[in-house]
Amino acid sequence: MLARHGPRYGGSVNGHSDDSSGDAKQAAPTLYIFPHAGGTAKDYVAFSREFSADVKRIAVQYPGQHDRSGLPPLESIPTLADEIFAMMKPSARIDDPVAFFGHSMGGMLAFEVALRYQSAGHRVLAFFVSACSAPGHIRYKQLQDLSDREMLDLFTRMTGMNPDFFTDDEFFVGALPTLRAVRAIAGYSCPPETKLSCPIYAFIGDKDWIATQDDMDPWRDRTTEEFSIRVFPGDHFYLNDNLPELVSDIEDKTLQWHDRA
């Protein structure tokens, strides 16, 4: 495990550095953080603050959210990933080292965006996926058979939202676009030959019934590099009670792969 100390690299901490001087290897790696369904960048402030200055952190605000809770407009995971990639591209030079973390739905989006970075020639150090089933192993394929009310009930359990919101008819009607988003999440898949050329590290809570260890283990088939899965105590939002240990693991692995490059 790497020792914690002052920053090893120049540049800003919470965003892209405009400093173009020096060897690209000396640039601090940037970790892009993808929130869960219904989450916003603000929900990951505590997570971001656990890192040292050795890793830059950028939490992604999904298009159409404007800092509000709730899912962004979502036709499909790849379509939203295209939008996010177009939004993010100006923030990274081709040689800047990047890594990706995604929790729940954010894991699917982070994977798709990481693939786009890889295809564009960027240095992707690692992909960290949290509480997110591997493509083709996502549960609740039966969502097409659920009523609107049943699907919204499932959504509240997936996101931790207050279910009382959906007892109000006006709020319920306004939440109907969420149904399309949940179906898009449940229907996400990609060809089996689609892989990242960086390591994949998976994290999960031992009491998570939304994404189980069996659901996440097939992430090993989505990398040509090493894979591991770590189980923490807790449910789908296990990370809230395990931030120091989780962040330490992510930071250590990011810096180790950065130093190998």
From Swiss-Prot:
One of its GO terms (molecular function) is acetylesterase activity. Its EC number is 3.1.2.-, 3.1.1.6, 3.1.2.2. One of its GO terms (biological process) is DIM/DIP cell wall layer assembly. Strongly inhibited in vitro by CyC17, a monocyclic enol phosphate analog to Cyclipostins, which binds covalently to the catalytic Ser-104 residue leading to a total loss of enzyme activity. Methyl arachidonyl fluorophosphonate (MAFP) inhibits esterase activity but it only reduces by approximately 50% thioesterase activity with palmitoyl-CoA as substrate. Thioesterase activity is inhibited by tetrahydrolipstatin (THL). Optimum temperature is 37 degrees Celsius (with palmitoyl-CoA as substrate). SUPFAM superfamilies: alpha/beta-Hydrolases (SSF53474). The active site is at 104, 208, 236. Monomer. Can form homodimers in the presence of palmitoyl-CoA. Interacts with the C-terminal region of PpsE. This is Thioesterase TesA. The gene is tesA.
